[in-house]
Structure formats: C-alpha cells, structure tokens
C-alpha cells in the first residue's frame, strides 16, 4: 500500500479488499497453500441520492448449502444474478428472501427498516453474512438510545416501512429511495445511522 501512494492523489476514495485464496488443489483446495492478496482500487463513495430496490426471485442459501458465514467469492454469483434481474427491471439493487420467504438482505449489503421510530433488521439466521458494519451500526444505534430489534422481517414489513436503508463495507450506510413503485424519503433514522457510523469511523481513524 505505501508503494502505491504516489499513484493516488490525496483525497481519493479507495476500496480496500483483502482476499485469501488457495493456490493449489483441484476438487479439494489445499488450505496449507493459502495465499493473500490486497486489492486496492479507486471507487467513489455513494452520494446522498440513495438507491432503488425491488424484490428478487432469487433466494439466499441456507448454511447447509453454502458457506454463508464467510465473505466467500463463491456466493457472489447468487447476488449478481439478483442484481442483473433488478437492473433489467430498472432498479439499482435487489431485496433477497431466505428459503422460508422472509427477508434476508440486499444482494450486496444488509437491510434495515424503520417504522414509527423503531429500527429493525433481519435476525441472523445463517442465510446472510452478519457483517462487521452491520454489527457496528447495531451497537451504535443502541448506544444512542434507538429502539433496535433483530427479528424476522416479511415483504409486507418492508413495504410498510417508513424508511429502508442498507449497511455494508462499501457504502457503509445508504438509504433506499424507492422499493418497487413506492418512493421513500431519506429519513431521520437512516441519517442518524449514517452520521453515527461516519463519526465513529472518523474518530477511530484518528487514533
């Protein structure tokens, strides 16, 4: 990373992606041959415009079907198919369900809703990655006095929500401006979650 600083102007927004992969093995990769690569590339942070989402026909896998407890590259095609389907309908992202028909997450990030001042996010049932950003946002909101609940969410819950937003490594906290044909405002809970996270990240980065 230090060697590449001269190639990047100050203030450039970068995405840093650490990756582990097995360099040997055929059907069964040789874990002892695991190698590491750090992928750094320029990509701007999302703006305040938010993103649109629709419900996907593709479902998230159960943990006995795929390594859902890891950020594994083999899981990406599942989300990519959902995003392609959403794009063909004119949406930016997709809301994916689990095998029971409950909300799992967005194709690329965890999902949150706000209704009557209460923030809810799907309970960790093993069908999605309980990511670092999700856990951080959850802790920050609770510490700030917000009523936050981890529970099963249905499509009807999302459709009736006052706000919908996401959390993830790339966008951090980003609000949803439209679910299907219903427009949504950048509401107070999404703004609060975004500010809490960015304030935390800035204060941590200065240490």
Locations of regions flagged by a protein language model:
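Short, acidic/charged, Gly/Pro-enriched secondary-structure junctions
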Residues: 1-26
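Helix-start/capping segments and mature chain N-termini
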Residues: 2-3, 21, 29-207
């Amino acid at each position: 990373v230090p060697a590449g600083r001269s190639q990047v102007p100050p203030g450039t927004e970068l995405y840093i992606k650490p990756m582990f992969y097995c360099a040997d093995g055929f059907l069964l990769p040789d874990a002892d041959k695991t190698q590491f690569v750090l992928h750094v590339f320029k990509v701007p942070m999302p703006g305040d415009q938010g993103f649109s989402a629709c419900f996907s026909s593709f479902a998230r896998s159960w943990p006995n079907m795929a390594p859902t407890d890891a950020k594994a590259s083999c899981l990406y095609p599942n989300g990519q198919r959902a995003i392609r389907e959403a794009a063909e309908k004119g949406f930016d992202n997709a809301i994916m369900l689990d095998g029971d028909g409950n909300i799992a997450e967005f194709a690329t990030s965890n999902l949150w809703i706000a209704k009557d001042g209460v923030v809810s996010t799907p309970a960790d049932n093993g069908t999605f990655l309980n990511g670092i950003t999700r856990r951080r946002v959850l802790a920050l909101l609770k510490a700030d006095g917000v009523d936050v609940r981890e529970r099963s969410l249905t499509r009807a819950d999302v459709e009736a929500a006052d706000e919908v937003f996401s959390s993830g490594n790339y966008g951090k906290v980003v609000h949803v401006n439209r679910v299907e044909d219903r427009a949504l405002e950048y509401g107070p809970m999404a703004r609060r979650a975004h500010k809490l996270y960015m304030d935390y990240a800035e204060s941590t980065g200065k240490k």
